[in-house]
Amino acid sequence: MTIALTGGGTGGHLAIVRCLLESAIKKNIECVYIGSQNGQDKAWFENEVRFKEKFFLSSKGVVNQSKFGKISSLLHTLKLSKDCREIFKKYHIQAVFSVGGYSAAPASFAALFSHLPLFIHEQNSKSGSLNMLLKPFATKFFSAFEKEISPYPVADKFFDNARIRKELKNIIFLGGSQGAQFINELALNLAPKLQEQNIKIIHQCGKNDFEKCKKHYQSLNIQADIFDFSLNLEEKMKNADLAISRAGASTLFELCANTLPTIFIPYPYAAKNHQYFNAKFLQDQALCQIFMQNSINLDEFFKSILKLNLENISTRLQNITQKNGADMLIQKALFDNLTFIR
C-alpha cells in the first residue's frame, strides 16, 4: 500500500508528518510526501530518504490576501491539484493523509477529485481554514481537542525522557526554533531573580537573538545553557523542572508527553488566537498556567513560578497524551477504514 502524506509549513505540522511516516513504515506502508517550496517543508524533508518520493510544489497561502489574491491562489491551487492527481496515478496512491497548512491544499483537493480517501489531522484547538473547508468531505477527521478525542502524534523520545518533577532546580525557556523575542526578553529579565533562588536556566532563543542573549548572560555572570536550535530538544526538557513556552499544539503535547509542567505565554497574533485555546485545554484541567503577553507583570510572574505544585501537575500530565499516537491514527485511518481503500 502507498499513501500520500501532505501538509506542513511550520515545525508543528511537520513533526506530525514525521510521526505518521515512522508509523506507516512499521506497517510496511510506503509514503509519498507532497509539500511546498515555501515554509519549512523542504528544510525538514528534502533529504528524508524514507519517503518513496517527495514533491515540493509552488503552493500559496490564501489567508490575509486581497480578494484578487485569494482568487489567484485558488486557481493556482486547482492547477497544482491536477499535478497531484498525476502523482497519485504514477505512484498508485490509495489514500491521502493531510496535517493541514496551505501546502496541504493541492493534494487534499486532488484526493477529493480522484475519489480517494482523505484523512485529516487538525493539530490545534481552533481548526485552520483549509481543514474547516475540507472537514465535511473527509473520510475521517482527527483532533485531540474534539469530543471524539484522537491521540496526538508525539515522537516516542519525549515519553522516554519523562519523569515526575518534584523540585524547581532548572527552568527552560522555549522560544521555538525561530525564537520568540518576548520570551527571550522575559528570560533575561528574570535571570537575576532565578539566580538568587539557585534556579538554573536552559534557554532556546533562536538564531536571531542568540548572540544578544549569550552576551547578556555573560554580563550577569550566569552560566545558562543557551542554544538556538536542537534536534534533541527532549534531552533539554529532561533536565528541566518547569517550562516557559509558547502554546503551539505540537510543543504543548510534547511537554505533556514529557510530563513537564509549563507556564504558557500564547503567541498573541496566532490565527484565531488558537495558541490561547490550545493552552486553555490544559488550564481547564488545572494542568498549566497561562499569562497573556500584553499584561505580564514581572514580579507576579516570578511569584507564580515559585508557587506551582510541580509534582501534582507533573503526575497528572501523564494522563493527557499517550505513546504511539501516530500508530493509532494510522490504524484508525487505514485499517479500520479498509472498505475505503481501493
Swiss-Prot record:
Its EC number is 2.4.1.227. It is found in: Cell inner membrane. GO terms for cellular component: plasma membrane. InterPro entries: GlcNAc_MurG, Glyco_trans_28_C, GlycoTrans_28_N. Its main location: membrane. Keywords: Cell cycle, Cell division, Cell inner membrane, Cell membrane, Cell shape, Cell wall biogenesis/degradation, Glycosyltransferase, Membrane, Peptidoglycan synthesis, Transferase. GO terms for molecular function: UDP-N-acetyl-D-glucosamine:N-acetylmuramoyl-L-alanyl-D-glutamyl-meso-2,6-diaminopimelyl-D-alanyl-D-alanine-diphosphoundecaprenol 4-beta-N-acetylglucosaminlytransferase activity; undecaprenyldiphospho-muramoylpentapeptide beta-N-acetylglucosaminyltransferase activity. Pfam families: Glyco_tran_28_C, Glyco_transf_28. It is a peripheral membrane protein. One of its GO terms (biological process) is lipid glycosylation. UDP-N-acetyl-alpha-D-glucosamine binds at residues 10-12, 124, 177, 275. Pathway: Cell wall biogenesis; peptidoglycan biosynthesis. It catalyses: di-trans,octa-cis-undecaprenyl diphospho-N-acetyl-alpha-D-muramoyl-L-alanyl-D-glutamyl-meso-2,6-diaminopimeloyl-D-alanyl-D-alanine + UDP-N-acetyl-alpha-D-glucosamine = di-trans,octa-cis-undecaprenyl diphospho-[N-acetyl-alpha-D-glucosaminyl-(1->4)]-N-acetyl-alpha-D-muramoyl-L-alanyl-D-glutamyl-meso-2,6-diaminopimeloyl-D-alanyl-D-alanine + UDP + H(+). Gene3D superfamilies: Glycogen Phosphorylase B. NCBIfam families: murG. Belongs to the glycosyltransferase 28 family. MurG subfamily. PANTHER family: GLYCOSYLTRANSFERASE, UDP-N-ACETYLGLUCOSAMINE--N-ACETYLMURAMYL-(PENTAPEPTIDE) PYROPHOSPHORYL-UNDECAPRENOL N-ACETYLGLUCOSAMINE TRANSFERASE 1. Cell wall formation. Catalyzes the transfer of a GlcNAc subunit on undecaprenyl-pyrophosphoryl-MurNAc-pentapeptide (lipid intermediate I) to form undecaprenyl-pyrophosphoryl-MurNAc-(pentapeptide)GlcNAc (lipid intermediate II). This is UDP-N-acetylglucosamine--N-acetylmuramyl-(pentapeptide) pyrophosphoryl-undecaprenol N-acetylglucosamine transferase. It comes from Campylobacter jejuni subsp. jejuni serotype O:6 (strain 81116 / NCTC 11828). The lineage of its organism: Bacteria, Pseudomonadati, Campylobacterota, Epsilonproteobacteria, Campylobacterales. The gene is murG.
